[in-house]
């Protein structure tokens, strides 16, 4: 069930130091692990917090095997409820994910024509861009949401009779036409191309990230008109003005590969993550700290900490930063974010 992680998940350094005074409090994720995996608290307490002395991230070690990790993020908590809640709040109340003034600042200071994100599609800025492209109408949002859910469900025909299949097919056509007409009627202007890069990580939500039997990535692809692509060398040809990674860089066992992919393909990368200076919650194998920004800079990944520049009230310790492999890009944006 557990395995040792004796090197840093990000930089692969073996210079990791146990932090004896750091403990993580239980949360609803942890309570679910203990219950569903039938782990006693004594065994669970063997998980200790380590810090990488090279890049500054924190790690839980030992931690779950990759097989158990996949079970956690596909079965025990297969639904990314925070992500889906962001969508539901937007549809019902036109409330955006709380990123302070980030969207307005980025749009003002970066000419964005091609934009991409990694994995969780409702954690970042896709909802903001969608709202910019269409008439700001709650009735439109609710209408298209209902028709999307009905459309996806009408295509789920396993175990149905031939008559039900025939009727469902007719309904599917109606729902699909409703979606098309609603978008066409309410569209103001398509001003950018949007991409979502996905992978099959065992440390993040994917195959079972569903709401009302609809997968988040499928829903997002239709709602936002996304180009949905896999992380692979073939897709390095795509270039972006901005790449967003929102609470997902600590949900992959290959964070450096993901970050480098984003940096190599985009002028700017914006990252939103936990800032776990005082411990690390046990649903994470690793997490970032502000020390990580110094490591990036020393490795010519230039960055600016914008945590205090986006007018956000924080309930927890979090970190926002912009980065680029082009120093001129960061120097330019740093002057604009003062």
Features from the language model and the residues they span:
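S-adenosyl-L-methionine-dependent methyltransferase catalytic module, highlighting the catalytic core
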Residues: 2-5, 54, 245-247, 252-338
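Conserved N-terminal segment of class I S-adenosyl-L-methionine
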Residues: 1-242, 246, 257-259, 290, ...
């Amino acid at each position: 069930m557990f395995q040792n992680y004796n090197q840093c998940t990000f930089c692969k350094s073996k210079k990791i130091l146990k932090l004896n005074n750091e403990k993580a409090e239980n949360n609803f994720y942890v309570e679910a692990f203990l219950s569903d995996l039938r782990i006693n608290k004594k065994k669970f307490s063997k998980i200790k917090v380590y810090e990488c002395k090279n890049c500054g991230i924190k790690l839980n070690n030992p931690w779950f095997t990759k097989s158990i990790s996949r079970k956690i993020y596909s079965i025990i908590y297969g639904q990314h409820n925070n992500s889906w809640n962001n969508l539901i709040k937007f549809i019902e109340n036109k409330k955006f994910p709380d990123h302070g003034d980030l969207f307005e600042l980025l749009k003002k200071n970066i000419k964005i024509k091609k934009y991409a994100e990694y994995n969780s599609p409702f954690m970042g800025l896709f909802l903001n861009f969608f709202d910019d492209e269409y008439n700001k109408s709650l009735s439109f949002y609710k209408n298209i949401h209902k028709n999307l859910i009905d459309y996806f469900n009408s295509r789920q025909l396993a175990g149905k009779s031939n008559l039900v299949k025939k009727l469902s097919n007719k309904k599917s056509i109606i729902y699909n036409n409703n979606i098309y007409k609603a978008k066409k009627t309410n569209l103001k202007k398509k001003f950018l191309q949007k991409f979502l890069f996905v992978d099959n990580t065992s440390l993040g939500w994917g195959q079972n990230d569903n709401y009302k039997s609809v997968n988040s990535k499928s829903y997002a692809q239709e709602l936002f008109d996304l180009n949905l692509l896999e992380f692979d060398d073939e897709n390095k040809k795509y270039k972006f003005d901005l790449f967003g990674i929102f609470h997902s860089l600590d949900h992959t066992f290959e964070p450096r590969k993901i970050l480098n992919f984003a940096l190599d393909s985009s002028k700017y990368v914006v990252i939103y993550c936990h800032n776990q200076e005082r411990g690390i919650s046990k649903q994470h194998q690793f997490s970032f700290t502000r020390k990580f920004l110094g490591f990036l800079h020393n490795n010519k990944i230039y960055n600016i900490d914008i945590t205090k520049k986006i007018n956000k009230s924080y309930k927890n310790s979090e970190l926002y930063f912009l980065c680029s492999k082009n120093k001129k890009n960061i120097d330019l944006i740093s002057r604009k974010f003062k």
